Amino acid sequence: MNVDEFIMKIKRRETPFYDRLYRIAFAARHFEVPLVRGLHDAGYHERRFRIATWRSFWRAAYYQPIFRSRCARCGKNLHLMNSGQGIPVIEGDLRIVIGDNVTLYDRITLAGLTVGENPTLTIGDNTMIGMPIAIMVGGEVSIGSNCLIGSNLIADNPGHNLDYKRRFQKLVKIVIGKVKIGNYVFAGHQSMIVGNVTIGDGAIVGVNTVVTEDVPPFCIVSGNPARLLKKLPFPKEMIEIVGEKEYQKYLDAKIET
């Protein structure tokens, strides 16, 4: 009788002997030290503190400096949220410009397309980019200041040639637009922003929303494809900041029912 056959006899509990072995193995598998509330609660907090301290050390001493080395410009007070990967994945020859007080999660991808010309990603001051976003840049993607971005994908291009015969050929030109995300924009979790798109200041993109057309400032869009659900109050002080043209877009926007 080989080992596998022996194990199967235990699992099947074929005789009182194998049944006894099964019970012993079951008890051993489910053994744990009894809970001591104060002791184990302290152990939980100790573990959290130890992990946070370890990650903070490596973030400051290693991950943030090497990420900065890949940026054309990186402002002060960059903060990489370390969830285990360390730094964002940077693919291709991407020019990265980052403002002050920017927070990025490490589990994100920033990619410059080889078919693009000088692909550039710009992120404004006080903006937070959550995970697990992929930002695909063929030309230019700009994200304004004071934004919260939880999108799944931001891309100024379709990723591949639309011609099925040329789709798998390397270095084939594709349609490249420009993604411009204004200031104070909130893009919800798993949303997608694709194509030649402008999202106005103060706009909100709902969870799982797919944006393929411009979004007026201070408007809420949701759905696939995105549709206008609500117009937010437009602060008077913002009219001068965004300009009359953008304000007119807000006035002209129609809520879709």
Predicted regions: what they are:
Residues M1-N157, G182-Y184, P217, A226-K230, ...:
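Domain-scale signature associated with acetyltransferase and cell-envelope carbohydrate enzymes
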Residues M136-E140, Q190-I204, T209-T212:
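Beta-rich strand-turn-strand
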Residues G144-R166, L171-I176:
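Histidine/lysine/aspartate-rich catalytic loop segments that bind and position anionic ligands
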Residues L148, F186, G202-I204, I220-S222:
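Short-chain dehydrogenase/reductase
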Residues L153, H160, T198, T209-V210, ...:
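Flexible glycine-rich beta->alpha loop in the catalytic core of nucleotide-sugar glycosyltransferases
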Residues I174-K180, I193:
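Solenoidal tandem-repeat scaffolds enriched in leucines and small polar residues
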